[in-house]
Amino acid sequence: MGDYKSAKEAFVSDNPGASIWSINAVSLVALATYALWIALSPYIRHGLLNNYLICVLPLLFGVTIFSTSPLVFTSFLSIISLAFITKSQKCFKSVSSPEKPKGQWLDESDSDEEPAEPASAAGSAAVSPVKLLPSQVAFASGSLLSPDPTTSPMSPSSSSASGHEDPLGIMGVNRRRSLLEGVSLDVPSHIDSKVRISPVPYLRLKKSRATKAQWVKEKGRLPFLTVYRAHMMLMTVICILAVDFEVFPRWQGKCEDFGTSLMDVGVGSFVFSLGLVSTKSLSPPPPTPTPSSPALNSHIIPLTPSPFTSILISLRKSIPILVLGFIRLIMVKGSDYPEHVTEYGVHWNFFFTLALVPVLAVGIRPLTQWLRWSVLGVIISLLHQLWLTYYLQSIVFSFGRSGIFLANKEGFSSLPGYLSIFLIGLSIGDHVLRLSLPPRRERVVSETNEEHEQSHFERKKLDLIMELIGYSLGWWALLGGWIWAGGEVSRRLANAPYVFWVAAYNTTFLLGYLLLTHIIPSPTSSQTSPSILVPPLLDAMNKNGLAIFLAANLLTGLVNVSMKTMYAPAWLSMGVLMLYTLTISCVGWILKGRRIKI
C-alpha cells in the first residue's frame, strides 16, 4: 500500500497544465449540453434517466475521452440542438398562426376606411380592438341602455327616488352588479387577454388565478444562474474522481506551482459561485421588497448588529462546513489515503477555505460604504500580490513545514486570494440580483401587471448582458496585461493573475448561460419558462450543492480505497465514472424539491 500511495502522489504531481484557451474550449461542452437540453426538453419526459443522459453524460465524456478534441464534440452537440430547435419552431409556428375569419376581426391597419393610428410608447400597436355587443358596451361604460326611460337605473326619476334612501349610491352599484350576471363577454379564445375595447377606452379582462399565481411563483427564478452553478458543481464532482484515472488527461489536473488547468479554475469557480449567491446576505437590502428566488437564496445575516456580532453570526453559520473539514481530515489521516500535500498543506483542506472566506467578507463589509465589492477585491488581491512577491512566495515554495503555519502554508497564504475571488463574485451578484427587483414605475394602461413586470425583466436582462460583456472584457484585459508583463498564474498561491483569471472565466461563462436563455427561443409560448430552461436534476444540485459535494467526496474516497484507479484501463475507468456520476445524480434526484442546508 505504501508503494502505491507514493506512486499515486507522484501520478498527480508536477502537472504542467494547459493553455487558457484549451481550458475554455473544454468548458464549452457545458454550454452545449445546456443548449441540447433546451432543444430536446419538449420531446422527452423530464425523468432521472433523461436528465442524466442529456445533462451529465455528455459533460463526463467532454472532460475525459473527448477533451483532446473539445470543439469537435461541442460542434456535434450544437448541430443536434440546432436541428431540434429549428424543427420545434416550425411546428410551433404552424399551430400558433390561426387564419383570421374574414369580415369579423380587423386590425385598424387592415381597414381601408381610416389610416392606422400610430403606435403608442407603451407598445399598444400590438393590441387589437374587439367588437362588443351594445349591452356589453353599455355595461363597460357604467350604464345599461333600456328601452323604457322610466325604468332605467340612470333616469332622473330613479335617481331622485333613491336619493334619500341610498345617499352613497350603494344600491345603484349593487343593481349594476346584479345586471352583470346576465351579461357575457363573448371574446374569441384565440384573442389575447390584453385588448383595447372600442369605443370604451380600456377594459381589463382578468386572467385566471391559476395562471397568474404560477407566473408570480416562477418569475423570481433565474434559470441561467441555476444552471451555471449546477454545471460548476457537476464539473467539480466529475473531476475530483476522474483525476485519479488515466483516462483523465494529466494536463487537466491541478498544477504544482504555476500554470493553468481545468481543475485549477474549478477550485476558484467554487468560491466565485459562493460569493455570487451570498449577495443577499452580505449586501445592503434593496429599497423595495424582492421576490424570493431559489437561485439567489442564501442564509441572511442581519445588518443591524455590530461588526463583531455579525462576524460571530457568520462564524456560527460556518460551523457545519468546518465540521466537514475536520471529518475529512480525520478520514484522510486515519486511512493512509493518498494526498497531495502541496495543494493546501498537511492539515488544511478546501472545506476550511469555504468556511472562513464568508467570515472574512463580513469583517470587511463596513468598507462597502465607500468602496464596491469588486474594488475591494482588486485592492486585496494587489496587496496580497505585493506580499507574495517580496516575502511570502519564497516561504510557500520552501520545503520547511515545522509548526502549524508552515505545515499549512498553502492554505493560510491563499486565503487573501480566495477572499478577493469571493468579493468579486459578490459584485457580480449585485448586478444579477437586479433581475429579481420589481419595477418601480407605473405601468401603462394597455399592460397588465404581469406583462409590465415581464417587460421590465426583459429590459433588465439586456442591461445585465451588456454589463457582463463589459466586465468580461475588463477581466480578460487585466489578465492578458499581467501575463504580457511576465506574470504567471498560480492556484497554489491564489495570486493576482489567478484571481483575474477566475473572475474572467466565470463572468464569461455566466454571460454564456444568460445568452442561451435569451437567444434560443423556447418551443413553448413562454420563452423564459423555468420548467423548460432548468433541468430538474440541475435544479436539485443547485439547491443542495454542499450535500452533493459531500456525497461526491465520500464516494471518491470509497472508490480510491477499493481499487487502484491509476492502473485501470479506459473501459473500466469510464464504467466506474458513469456509475459514480449516476449515483450522484440519484442522490440529487432524491433531494429534488428539498433544500439541505449544511
Swiss-Prot record:
Q: Which residues are glycosylated?
A: 560
Claim: DNA damage is one of the keywords in the record: no
**Where is region (Disordered) located?**
94-127, 144-167
Q: Which Pfam families match?
A: GWT1 (PF06423)
Say yes or no: keyword Transmembrane present. yes
Residue spans crossing the bilayer:
20-40, 53-73, 223-243, 258-278, 307-327, 344-364, 377-397, 412-432, 464-484, 500-520, 571-591
Give the Enzyme Commission number: 2.3.-.-
State where composition is biased (Low complexity). Answer: 117-127, 144-162
Top-level class of the enzyme under EC nomenclature: transferase
Provide a GO biological process annotation.
GPI anchor biosynthetic process
Give the pathway annotation.
Glycolipid biosynthesis; glycosylphosphatidylinositol-anchor biosynthesis
* A molecular function GO annotation: glucosaminyl-phosphatidylinositol O-acyltransferase activity
Chief location category: endoplasmic reticulum
- Record's bilayer topology term: Multi-pass membrane protein
Acidic residues: compositionally biased ranges: 107-116
Annotated function: Probable acetyltransferase, which acetylates the inositol ring of phosphatidylinositol during biosynthesis of GPI-anchor.
The UniProt similarity line reads: Belongs to the PIGW family.
**In its UniProt entry, what is this protein called?**
GPI-anchored wall transfer protein 1
* Lineage, top ranks: Eukaryota, Fungi, Dikarya, Basidiomycota, Agaricomycotina
